[in-house]
């Protein structure tokens, strides 16, 4: 690394993209940092793949318990405790977030906490403090889009689904992709 810069590489965003590019560069000896203003792991870990699969697995168990009597099991199904599943899900995700903090430290990747903005092609500002790098990778992730349709203000996004404190009695899901189908299965449990 040249003494001209604080880092060889700074990745803005600690999701799959930012973490993997910093990890690879650090493995080759580059001095790296990752900037994140939220939870480590990005969308997949926090409001995507991981929490959805945990909820999906819980729903599958609920369906299996219901079907068990058809296979000779005499089980009493006392229902599905939404709050218990959400608590377990959040504990699991928190463990992944904490693992990333330790992993970055073990990989000699600095963790810069805050909101990053570009100053110039080699400089970022993180909540009032400036850092320089030979390479800056912008990998900020995304948020779900709420469609511009009448009544959209009454709906929630997939992020909102993971913020639910109770399972709603009635739901209409807009969309038919695999995420929509899996969320429908969870809510039906």
Question: What annotation goes with each model-predicted range?
Answer:
Residues 15, 115-117, 177:
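Conserved acidic residues
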Residues 2-7, 23-30, 35-167:
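Glycine-rich flavin
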Residues 165-189:
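Rossmann-like NAD(P)H-binding beta-loop-alpha module
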Residues 12-13, 35, 138, 174-175:
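Conserved N-terminal Rossmann-fold NAD(P)-binding element of oxidoreductases
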Residues 7-34, 180-189:
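N-terminal Rossmann-like FAD-binding beta1-loop-alpha1 element of flavoenzymes
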């Amino acid at each position: 690394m040249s003494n001209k810069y604080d880092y060889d590489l700074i990745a803005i965003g600690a999701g799959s993209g930012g973490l993997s590019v910093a990890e690879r560069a650090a493995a080759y000896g580059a001095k790296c940092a990752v900037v994140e203003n939220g939870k480590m792991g990005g969308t997949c870990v926090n409001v995507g793949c991981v929490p959805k699969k945990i909820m999906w697995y819980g729903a599958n168990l609920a369906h299996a318990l219901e079907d068990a009597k058809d296979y000779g099991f005499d089980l009493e199904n006392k229902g599905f405790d939404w709050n218990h599943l959400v608590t377990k899900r959040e504990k699991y995700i928190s463990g992944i977030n904490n693992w990333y903090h330790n992993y970055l430290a073990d990989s000699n990747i600095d963790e810069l906490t805050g909101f990053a903005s570009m100053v110039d092609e080699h400089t970022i500002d993180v909540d009032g403090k400036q850092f320089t790098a030979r390479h800056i990778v912008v990998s900020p992730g995304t948020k779900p889009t709420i469609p511009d349709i009448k009544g959209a203000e009454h709906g929630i996004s997939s992020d909102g689904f993971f913020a639910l404190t109770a399972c709603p009695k009635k739901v209409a899901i807009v969309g038919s992709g695999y995420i929509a189908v899996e969320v429908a299965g969870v809510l039906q449990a």
